[in-house]
Amino acid sequence: MISNGQSRVKRLIQQLEALGITNKEVLRVISETPRHLFMPESLAHKAYENTALPIGNGQTISQPLMVATMTQLLMQHHCKNVLEIGTGSGYQTAVLAQLVDKVFSVERIATLQYQAKRRMRQLDLHNVAMRHGDGWKGWRSKGPFDGIIVTAAASDIPQDLVDQLADGGVMIIPVGEQHQSQSLVVMRRFGDSLEQQRIGDVRFVPLVKGDVV
């Protein structure tokens, strides 16, 4: 017998497939990652709905479709060494950790980072390194990265992140001001040349500078 939880996960995966997610590994990992662990218990009944949900500190856990879309875009380039800007709940981090060799994740809000670390241990994911700091600055000492994924909208593409992108690397980043038009951008680096492709309209919380203890 299929449990209610399993049926909700199955329904979510079917929705993602219908909305254009075709990478079977991405779909598998999302189906196996317990999203309900990454949010307040009071919202856990909504965990497998295709919607963003608040996690406190003015932050959200991204809509599953957006996590799947950004991950699928990254995986098209066979990234192994990935920098994530904005750990948040750690859900995107956990998905990445099951698909790439190493994830380096930067979070500006210390309480969120602490909770995300605990969840990584709970899920036995040990290929994740976390840092409390300003996401605009990246994590220079661990770069360059062949993939960078940014989970909040930057007003413009941070130069520090561009500098930490390896030759041939790809950055997936939402760009635009809060409450205004935002676009999901795929940036590729080829030596000193940069190529940008706009994927579509999105809505993210802003990528704020500085950090919070």
Curated annotation (Swiss-Prot):
The enzyme's E.C. designation: 2.1.1.77
GO cellular component, one term: cytoplasm
One record GO biological process: protein modification process
PROSITE patterns: PCMT
Catalytic activity: [protein]-L-isoaspartate + S-adenosyl-L-methionine = [protein]-L-isoaspartate alpha-methyl ester + S-adenosyl-L-homocysteine
Active site: 62
Enzyme class: transferase
A molecular function (GO) term: protein-L-isoaspartate (D-aspartate) O-methyltransferase activity
Cellular compartment(s): Cytoplasm
Protein name: Protein-L-isoaspartate O-methyltransferase
Phylogenetic classification of the source organism: Bacteria, Pseudomonadati, Pseudomonadota, Gammaproteobacteria, Alteromonadales
